[in-house]
C-alpha cells in the first residue's frame, strides 16, 4: 500500500490521527476501515505531512470558494438542509472536525457515527458553502468504474498490484453504494445499467486489449462482467462509426446531491453530527495544549483530530500538497431528448 498516494486517491487527508492509520475508503463502502486494538479508530498518517511550517510554501491565495458560483443542475431544487447549521455558534471543541461537506466529508461522518464500528466521538463538519456544493454536487452523477481510462497509467507508475487494487476499489463502490441506498431507503434516482468504452484509434484499441488481457489474467471476479469487442462488432455494439474496439460493463447513475443530502439529513435527525455550513476554514494550527485550533470567519473551534475532505482546495490549508493536489476545471452537461 502506497502511504503517500492513499490520502489523495480517496478524497480525504487525515491530520493528527495515529501513525498506524489504514484508510481503505473514505467514500460509502464497508471497506472503510476504522479500527484500533483499543476500539477507537485507526488511520495511516500521511508520510508527506511536514510539521515545521517554516519549510512549507505559501498557501494558494484563491483556495476559498468564489462568490456567485455557477448553479449546478443538481441544485435547481435545494434541500432544506443545504445551508444548515446544527447550532447557532461553533461548538467549542470536538473529537473530530471534518473540513468539507461533500462526498468524502459526509461519507466519513456517516461511517464514523453509523458504520459497523460506530463510536461515541463528537464530530463537527465545516463547509465553506452549502452541503454538497463543490465537486460532489457538480459531477455527472455516474457510478462508473474506471476500468481503462487511468488504470494503465497507475499500472505503469506504481505496478500491476497497485493499479489493479484501484480498479477493484472502484468496482466495489457499485455494490457498496447500492447496499447503502437500500439500507437507508434513499431516494436518489439510483439506476444500475451498462456503460461502454469506445476506441476509434487503432493503436489505443490495441493498448486497451492488452490491458483487458492483463486484468483478465489476474482472475479478478469483476472481469467476468466486462465484454470486450473488436472491429465490426465494436461498431454494432457501440453504435459509433469507425469504432476499433469497445468494452461494456456494469455502471450506475444517481443524483449525488440527493444521496449526500439524505445522509446528512440522517446524521442531523439523529443528532450524531454538528454541521456548520457557510463556514470556510482559513487556517488550522496546532494547539500547544494538544489537538488543533480551526479558524473561520465565525470564530475558532478546537479539534483533537482533523479530517481534510475539501478535495481540490486542500492546498489552501496544507500547502505542502499544492503540487500533488491540483484543481482542474471540467464541463458537465445535462442533455434532455
Language model segments and positions:
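Redox-cofactor binding/interface segments in oxidoreductases and associated redox assembly factors
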Residues: 99, 145, 308-309
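Central helical "cap/lid" subdomain
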Residues: 296-337
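Helical element adjacent to the flavin cofactor pocket in flavoenzyme catalytic cores
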Residues: 241-303
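Glycine-rich Rossmann-fold phosphate-binding loop(s) that bind the pyrophosphate
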Residues: 100-106, 128
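Central beta-strand plus flanking loop segment that forms part of the substrate or channel wall
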Residues: 140-143, 148, 194-197, 322-337
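Glycine-rich FAD pyrophosphate-binding loop
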Residues: 115-138
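Extreme N-terminal leader/targeting segments of oxidoreductases
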Residues: 2-96, 114-121
Amino acid at each position: 500500500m502506497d502511504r503517500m498516494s492513499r490520502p489523495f486517491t480517496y478524497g480525504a487527508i487525515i491530520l493528527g490521527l495515529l501513525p498506524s492509520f489504514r484508510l481503505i475508503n473514505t467514500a460509502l463502502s464497508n471497506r472503510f476501515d476504522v479500527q484500533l486494538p483499543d476500539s477507537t479508530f485507526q488511520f495511516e498518517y500521511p508520510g508527506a505531512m511536514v510539521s515545521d511550517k517554516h519549510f512549507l510554501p505559501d498557501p494558494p491565495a484563491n483556495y476559498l470558494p468564489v462568490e456567485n458560483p455557477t448553479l449546478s443542475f443538481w441544485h435547481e431544487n435545494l434541500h432544506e438542509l443545504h445551508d444548515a447549521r446544527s447550532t447557532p455558534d461553533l461548538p467549542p471543541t470536538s473529537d473530530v472536525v471534518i473540513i468539507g461537506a461533500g462526498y468524502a466529508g459526509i461519507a466519513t461522518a456517516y461511517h464514523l457515527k453509523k458504520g459497523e464500528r460506530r463510536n461515541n466521538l463528537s464530530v463537527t463538519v465545516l463547509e465553506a458553502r452549502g452541503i454538497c456544493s463543490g465537486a460532489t454536487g457538480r459531477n455527472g452523477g455516474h457510478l462508473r468504474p474506471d476500468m481503462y481510462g487511468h488504470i494503465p497509467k497507475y499500472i505503469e507508475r506504481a505496478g500491476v498490484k497497485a493499479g489493479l487494487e484501484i480498479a477493484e476499489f472502484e468496482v466495489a463502490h457499485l455494490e457498496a453504494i447500492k447496499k447503502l441506498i437500500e439500507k437507508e431507503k434513499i431516494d436518489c434516482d439510483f439506476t444500475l445499467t451498462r456503460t461502454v468504452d469506445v476506441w476509434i484509434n487503432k493503436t489505443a484499441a490495441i493498448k486497451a486489449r492488452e490491458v483487458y488481457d492483463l486484468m483478465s489474467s489476474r482472475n479478478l471476479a469483476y472481469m467476468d462482467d466486462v465484454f470486450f469487442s473488436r472491429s465490426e462488432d465494436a461498431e454494432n455494439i457501440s453504435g459509433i462509426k469507425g469504432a476499433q474496439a469497445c468494452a461494456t460493463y456494469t455502471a450506475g447513475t444517481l443524483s449525488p446531491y440527493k444521496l449526500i443530502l439524505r445522509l446528512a439529513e440522517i446524521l442531523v435527525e439523529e443528532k450524531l453530527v454538528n454541521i456548520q455550513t457557510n463556514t470556510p476554514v482559513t487556517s488550522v494550527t496546532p494547539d500547544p495544549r494538544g489537538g488543533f485550533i480551526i479558524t473561520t470567519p465565525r470564530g475558532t473551534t478546537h479539534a483533537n483530530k482533523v479530517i481534510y475532505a475539501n478535495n481540490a482546495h486542500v492546498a489552501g490549508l496544507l500547502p505542502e500538497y499544492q503540487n500533488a493536489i491540483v484543481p482542474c476545471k471540467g464541463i458537465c452537461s445535462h442533455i434532455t431528448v
